[in-house]
């Protein structure tokens, strides 16, 4: 497996990668993902998350690679939807810049597929993706304040934190706490 280190917004690098490899499809996971950080630095999120998609799809179009799987997010769903969410639930009306970048990227890709039927586009919308390599060299191990639930759980499990705090007591559940589904 070849490894290229770079920025997805680097058009020359992307052209080189496509020229040196036979690429049939792209799985687009590149992007910044911390909701709180996106509120503090919205320009950074719009620049990185949207421009990376625009540059990537421009180069893909040029080389004739028209299959992409995009790592979106459940943050694209509107807050006024009935639960549980469905794929057909209303999107937009996002509450933070991170969500808006995912929503806008979906709109860009959907527009491309509408304009050119040769494009095959898959949008994955999920909640709190996590994972790590068995070696521990890559994965969720934040040194600062975690950005989602799973790093808190792992920090409690390894003894870095004494306990896990659960916030909220007014959710529509039998005990008022939030319910999350996890898939392994």
Model-derived segments and their meaning:
Residues 2-25:
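Conserved Rossmann-fold cofactor-binding substructure of NAD(P)-dependent oxidoreductases
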Residues 4, 19, 46, 122, ...:
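Conserved Rossmann-like nucleotide-binding pocket used by diverse enzymes
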Residues 26, 68:
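Receiver (REC) domain switch-region micro-motif
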Residues 30-33, 72-73:
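Conserved NAD(P)H cofactor-binding loop of Rossmann-fold oxidoreductase domains
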Residues 34-38:
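Serine-hydrolase catalytic-loop signature spanning alpha/beta hydrolases and amidase-signature enzymes
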Residues 40-58, 62, 66-67, 76-128, ...:
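Catalytic helix-loop patch of NAD(P)-dependent Rossmann-fold dehydrogenases
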Residues 110-184:
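NAD(P)-dependent short-chain dehydrogenase/reductase
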């Amino acid at each position: 497996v070849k490894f290229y280190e770079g920025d997805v917004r680097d058009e020359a690098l992307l052209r080189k990668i496509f020229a040196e490899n036979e690429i049939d499809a792209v799985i687009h996971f590149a992007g910044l993902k911390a909701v709180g950080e996106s509120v503090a630095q919205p320009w950074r999120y719009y620049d990185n998350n949207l421009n990376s998609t625009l540059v990537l799809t421009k180069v893909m179009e040029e080389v004739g690679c028209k299959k992409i799987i995009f790592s979106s997010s459940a943050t694209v769903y509107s807050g006024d939807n009935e639960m549980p969410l469905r794929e057909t639930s209303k999107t937009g009306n996002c509450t933070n810049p991170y969500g808006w970048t995912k929503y806008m990227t979906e709109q860009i890709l959907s527009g491309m597929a509408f304009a050119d039927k040769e494009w095959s586009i898959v949008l994955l919308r999920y909640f709190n993706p996590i994972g790590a390599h068995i070696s521990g060299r890559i994965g969720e191990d934040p040194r600062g304040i975690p950005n989602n639930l799973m790093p808190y759980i792992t920090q409690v499990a390894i003894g870095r934190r004494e306990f896990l705090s659960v916030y909220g007591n007014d959710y529509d559940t039998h005990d008022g706490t939030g319910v999350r589904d996890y898939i392994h």
